């Protein structure tokens, strides 16, 4: 009941210094898109339109719990939280060379800011609503509605963390 799966990515899309990331909660999907209409790599070198990329939990782990009370304990978890960090920002990479960094990663897996480290947990706050959320950047970048990347930070080098859990991992699974 305390296992998490995490998909971490440093999704350098073309020129790494002009990226945005986001999450689609309903699709359990994390994505990267360009912060500028043109990109030095795709437009300048290949003469191509700027692409986007995505990460999906095609099928999350069996939760081995009956969360909705229907008697079925083999339901599957989707993305249960999404976090991000921007290089050089206040929300940046956890410390990779210390135990403190492990506690920071645990916070990210549970959908909280990495610092201060666990057991202290500070939630992400959606600037468009003022509400706490476990899904950072879950707005719609096409319409500009909700919390989208670019509101708090300019385009830049991003990392994203998609999580699913907690769930029970049975022996032999």
Give the location of each predicted region:
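Extracellular/surface-associated beta-sandwich interaction domains
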Residues: 1-173
């Amino acid at each position: 009941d305390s296992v998490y799966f995490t998909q971490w990515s440093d999704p350098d899309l073309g020129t790494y210094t002009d990226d945005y990331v986001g999450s689609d909660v309903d699709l359990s999907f994390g994505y990267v898109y360009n912060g500028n209409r043109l990109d030095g790599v795709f437009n300048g070198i290949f003469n191509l339109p700027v692409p986007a990329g995505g990460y999906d939990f095609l099928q999350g782990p069996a939760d081995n719990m009956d969360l909705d009370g229907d008697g079925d304990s083999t339901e599957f978890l989707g993305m249960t939280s999404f976090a991000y960090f921007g290089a050089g920002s206040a929300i940046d990479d956890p410390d990779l060379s210390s135990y403190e960094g492990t506690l920071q990663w645990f916070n990210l897996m549970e959908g909280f800011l990495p610092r201060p480290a666990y057991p202290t947990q500070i939630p992400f706050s959606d600037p468009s609503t003022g509400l706490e959320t476990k899904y950072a950047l879950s707005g719609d970048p096409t319409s500009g509605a909700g919390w989208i990347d670019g509101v708090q930070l300019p385009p830049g080098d991003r990392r994203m963390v998609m999580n699913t859990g907690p769930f029970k991992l049975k022996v032999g699974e």
